[in-house]
Design a protein with these regions (language model features):
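Compact alpha-helical subdomains of small soluble proteins
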Residues: 88-142
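Post-signal peptide N-terminal segment of mature Sec-exported envelope proteins
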Residues: 25-47
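Acidic/histidine-rich, surface-exposed loop or edge segments in extracytoplasmic proteins
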Residues: 57-71
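C-terminal motif of bacterial Sec signal peptides marking the signal peptidase cleavage site
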Residues: 12-15
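Positively charged n-region of N-terminal signal peptides that target proteins for export
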Residues: 1-5
Length: 142
């Protein structure tokens, strides 16, 4: 009987290991400069850096050109999408933490200007289309 207990104890010890999770996030050292989009406005002292392989090429080739959407239209979408994004960041067991890593500090009462709203809007469209996510009640379209 003692040998059964010892055997079970050894089996229990051997089975108590942590799972080896392999992260599918891109290695930041292997990302080219072309895949980094930097948006800065020195007047209100903010900076947005988007590090997403393929986004810059998508922005230049597929996204609607600047001026296509009004700033008001993009701000409305950005507010809704950022709220949902931040909600998902805070729920890593329900949503993939590799997709939703950091919160976006986007405050509706601040006028970020056209360029920031344009690039944030297009990144959120790109993100939803690339990763098949829906951040709002409507599908993003180009």
């Amino acid at each position: 009987m003692k040998t059964v207990y010892i055997f079970l104890l050894i089996l229990l010890c051997l089975s108590c290991g942590t799972a080896n999770n392999v992260s599918e996030t891109p290695d930041l050292q292997n990302i080219s400069e072309e895949d980094i989009v930097r948006i800065a406005n020195d007047d209100i002292e903010y900076e947005i850096i988007i590090i997403e392989p393929g986004f810059n090429a998508w922005l230049q080739s597929i996204a609607r050109p600047e001026g296509y959407y009004s700033q008001n239209y993009m701000e409305t979408r950005n507010i809704q999408w950022v709220l949902e994004w931040n909600r998902r960041v805070l729920q890593p067991f329900q949503f993939d933490p590799n997709l939703y890593q950091l919160q976006i500090d986007y405050q509706p009462q601040i006028d970020y200007g056209y360029e920031v709203n344009y690039k944030l809007f297009n990144y959120l469209v790109y993100f939803q289309m690339t990763y098949k996510q829906r951040l709002g009640g409507f599908m993003p379209r180009i």
